[in-house]
Amino acid sequence: VISQVLAAVGLILCCTGGVLHLQARREKDRRRSDAAAEAAAGTATRLQLSIDLLRRAHPDQVADTTFSVGQLQVLIIGGTIIALFLVASVHLTIMVLVGAVILLYLASLAVRLRLFRLGLDQDALVQIDDRTARAFPDSRLPTYTVLVPAYGEPEVFGRLVENLRALEYPREKLEIMLLLEADDTETISAARKAVGDVLDFSVVLVPAAEPRTKPKALNYGLIKARGDLVAVYDAEDRPDPLQLRKAAMVLADAPADVACVQAKLGFFNPNQNLITRWFTLDYRMWFGELLPGLVRLRAPIPLGGTSNHFRRTVLLEVGAWDAFNVTEDADLGIRLYRAGYRTGVLDSITLEEANSDLVNWVKQRSRWYKGYAQTLLVHLRQPDRFRREIGLRPLLLTCLFVGGTPMLAVLNSFFWGCVIVWFIFQPHFFREVLPTLTYFLGMISWIGGNAVILYTWLLSARRAEDKLVIAAILSPLYWILMAMAATKAAVQLITAPSYWEKTQHGLDHGSAEEPGSAAAA
């Protein structure tokens, strides 16, 4: 009887244990399912937020449409007026239009020359030597998040991780996020292999969704970021190892209205071919003279796409990056200025890969030109409000510099073409639409403008080696490439405004020149 009772009790306990185990497993599965659903919901929320960050802060400054209703009305009315004048007098209308274009061209050239001359004085740059940077106490350094978006470039990650690990910053205060598209399996695999078990690196997968742009990925990473400061690097970058410390020092001691520090950019393969030499000179002027010139004039700074260092709170306040703008950097720089913040230019160099392939270069440059036009159109949707926020002079500087960059590329080739046609064919039509005053203005624009551009290139190259001086002399050929890129940008601005043409990297064949070389701006 006792044995039967014990057997019955054992059977009951066994059944009860089985039921409890089954319930526990179901509860575990439910929690796992709930966690997965919560994670999926969190991912979806972060994705939508990464697209809408700017829309929530400034819905009128999102570049999801090329022209606002008001701008379309101006275009239609302006086009109608020009058409009516053409009907009344073709020659007079063309003469006036050509004269207006010449004056606009001269104004843009004058602005660039003024910025160049101001930028030659390196006092506009924030300069911190390596010894001072290393002496800055670690205890005063803030936490830092480094965002590195990448797509379709698995070959760069070995070098990338090596370059970022060389950054001299307390590891406990540093987090580095590699922002990768979730369906880019080859790049994800390469990144995870390169990162290994390095604690301050994390691979963040950005869900595949439109718009598939760098700024959307940056926003996705920013939402997860924990650092007080945020830096952006590209996947092929080789930053100055002390750049984070230097930027942190600047932002620690600067007034609260200094929200961003832009480091200078150069190339590690400047002498690979003629295109890379031209590109190097281009960067030398942009980061070495033109941006410092803007700093001295206290004008808006169109940021470069990498080596930007921000206060995270300010970045979130202004809406971060526009997910639809293909030059989100230039747009953000202007938006910071509109919000009352300033940008400094730091004399610390990040080396990039200079584009050495002609087709690849045109793709990249046309995206930049398209983005500059996008940016200007966005900020001119409400021109009177824009003027009130930043002032008349900064507004004119922004229009002539940001808008003038692609405009000069097109008009320079237009003037060259007109002069060539005139000297070869001397068409009677030119005599009718180009009276003496307009003709001489045009000649001044062509001869004087090209002389000024060539002079600035030669001056920028004078401290470099002879190969860059020769490239500067041959720069008129580079202007033809610029015109091609600007024309392509104008077409894409209408047909595919938010399309991000990927720049192919890894074409440098292992070049590794030192920061003190001609690559440095």
Name these PLM-found stretches.
Residues 110-146, 150-172:
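N-terminal signal-anchor transmembrane helix
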Residues 193-229, 241-326, 358, 362, ...:
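Long helical/loop segments within the catalytic core of UDP-sugar-dependent glycosyltransferases
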Residues 326-332:
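Acidic donor-binding loop at a coil-to-helix junction in glycosyltransferase catalytic cores
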Residues 165-209:
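Acidic donor-binding segment of Leloir-type glycosyltransferases
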Residues 84-114, 118-119, 125-128, 136, ...:
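Membrane-embedded multi-pass helical conduit in multi-pass membrane proteins
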Residues 333-351:
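Catalytic donor-sugar/metal-binding loop of nucleotide-sugar-dependent glycosyltransferases
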